[in-house]
């Protein structure tokens, strides 16, 4: 039995799981407040009376954003006052992404949520002295955002263990692209097609077809595949390794983009003026298999599928 889910990342404006602030972080909206109360991190009266303004068939994400973090602040304050025995180990195991994510979120809060590209130039360019000063200034906020991730992942791994014990495997979803307003782009600009001002030169989407005369303009920054190839695809290996710790099976979204990807000049209002560029092909997945071994992957091969895309799916060995 399988349970297929959407991406778990923290959602940004528009509330799409395919536009996340981080490819490694979990969404705080999924943290179960009743479980926090059972753990002694909340009192029921601290959240039971809150009107989340939702109905059984509709979530009010605006209300969640406005009201949930105040509750999580109380839980995290108690957690940080007496950290669990495994907390230091959690921080150590996630040190490759968590400190940058927590700093990014603290800085977003300090800048009223605006995109990182609108921050002061030293912060945009991650000048070491400026980052050190920010880490000191926002230390309490950084601690909060790290603690939130501990709560999310503790509950998630308990949920996955329960599902697996019932004979249920979880199919997770990995978006091919990350959001422009994400810690992934801010912390690793060299991995994306950005200009000297850290602005995308080309963005992602799909060409016009029978369903859409203008195509689809997703707007995500595109990868510098030459850089990823030169670095042995380490970022991708880390990203996929993280996914396989969360899920039993990983569905890779827009798999055809690894064969060829659609590139649209930044600033366009539609996808009409885009063109196809060559992706990394099977080389990426061979490097991933060398590093991680064989894993259960599903290749989402919808959309404009060519013989070349079919060959890549066949070479990879992944079911489509």
What is the predicted role of each segment?
Residues 1-11, 242-247:
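Catalytic domains of carbohydrate-active enzymes, especially glycoside hydrolases
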Residues 2, 167-171, 296:
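Residues at or immediately flanking beta-strands
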Residues 4-9, 172-174, 253-254, 301:
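Glycine-rich, histidine-containing beta strand-loop boundary motifs that form or position
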Residues 14-153, 178-320:
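Alpha-amylase-like alpha-glycosidases and glucanotransferases acting on alpha-linked glucans and related
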Residues 145-178:
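Conserved, well-ordered alpha-helix/loop/beta-strand core segments that scaffold catalytic motifs
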């Amino acid at each position: 039995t399988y349970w297929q889910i959407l991406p778990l990342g923290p959602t940004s404006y528009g509330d799409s799981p395919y536009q996340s602030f981080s490819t490694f972080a979990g969404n705080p909206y999924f943290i179960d407040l009743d479980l926090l109360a059972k753990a002694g991190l909340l009192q029921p009266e601290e959240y039971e009376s809150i009107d989340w303004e939702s109905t059984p068939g509709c979530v009010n994400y605006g209300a969640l954003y406005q009201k949930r973090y105040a509750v999580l602040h109380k839980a995290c304050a108690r957690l940080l006052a007496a950290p669990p025995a495994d907390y230091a180990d959690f921080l150590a195991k996630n040190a490759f992404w968590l400190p940058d994510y927590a700093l990014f979120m603290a800085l977003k809060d300090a800048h009223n949520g605006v995109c990182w590209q609108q921050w002061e130039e030293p912060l945009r360019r991650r000048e070491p002295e400026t980052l050190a000063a920010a880490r000191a200034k926002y230390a309490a906020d950084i601690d909060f955002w790290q603690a939130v991730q501990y709560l999310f992942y503790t509950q998630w791994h308990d949920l996955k263990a329960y599902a697996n014990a019932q004979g249920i495997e979880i199919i997770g979803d990995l978006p091919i692209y990350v959001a422009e307003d994400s810690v992934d782009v801010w912390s690793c600009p060299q991995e994306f097609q950005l200009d000297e001002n850290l602005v995308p030169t080309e963005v992602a989407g799909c060409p016009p077809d029978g369903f859409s005369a203008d195509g689809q303009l997703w707007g995500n920054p595109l990868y510098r595949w030459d850089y990823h190839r030169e670095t042995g695809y380490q970022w991708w290996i880390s990203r996929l390794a993280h996914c396989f710790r969360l899920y039993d099976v990983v569905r890779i979204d827009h798999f055809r983009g690894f064969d060829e990807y659609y590139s649209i000049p930044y600033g366009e209002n539609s996808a009409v003026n885009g063109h196809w560029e060559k992706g990394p092909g099977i080389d990426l997945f061979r490097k991933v298999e060398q590093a991680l071994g064989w894993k259960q992957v599903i290749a989402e091969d919808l959309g404009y599928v060519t013989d070349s895309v079919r060959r890549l799916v066949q070479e990879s060995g992944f079911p489509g």
